[in-house]
């Protein structure tokens, strides 16, 4: 009888371990735009006009701003001559491939994932 009880307890423990192993993990929450900006953009760009300029211009209030026109930043010739204002569509194209928007620009960053670009653009809009 003792062996039967011990065997039953062992079986219950093993079955519960198998059930635990088959439980799905909760879905990971994708990073938000602020986190993605810090990870992928903040090396070159600030979000504050009072901070020193970095390799790229500050991006605070970029949505609606005329491209290539932050005072004190030295833009490439192509970007300095740009005649458009930044909007969601233009920012999405820019983050996908800056060279396709304005050939000859210095920015090397490219983001292939639409959801990552959308999160970064949403964050930039919040800075307006």
Residue ranges and their predicted role:
Residues 33, 38-47, 120, 124:
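The canonical Cys-X-X-Cys-His
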Residues 87-128:
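C-terminal capping alpha-helices of c-type cytochrome domains
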Residues 1-8:
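Bacterial N-terminal signal peptides that target proteins for export
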Residues 69-89:
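Short Fe-S-cluster ligation motifs
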Residues 12-20:
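C-terminal segment of classical bacterial N-terminal signal peptides
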Residues 53-58:
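Short cysteine/histidine-rich zinc-coordinating motifs and their immediately flanking basic loops
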Residues 45-51, 64:
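Detector for the c-type heme attachment site
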Residues 19-38, 51-52:
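Electrostatic cytochrome c docking/interface patches
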């Amino acid at each position: 009888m003792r062996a039967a009880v011990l065997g039953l307890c062992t079986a219950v423990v093993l079955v519960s371990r198998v059930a635990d192993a088959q439980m799905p993990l909760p879905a990971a929450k994708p990073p938000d735009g602020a986190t993605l900006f810090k990870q992928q953009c903040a090396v070159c760009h600030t979000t504050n006009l009072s901070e020193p300029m970095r390799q790229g211009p500050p991006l605070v209030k970029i949505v609606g701003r005329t491209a290539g026109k932050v005072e004190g930043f030295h833009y490439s010739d192509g970007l300095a001559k740009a005649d458009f204002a930044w909007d969601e569509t233009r920012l999405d194209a820019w983050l996908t491939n800056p060279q396709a928007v304005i050939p000859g620009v210095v920015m090397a960053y490219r983001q292939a994932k639409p959801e990552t670009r959308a999160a970064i653009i949403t964050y930039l809009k919040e800075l307006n």
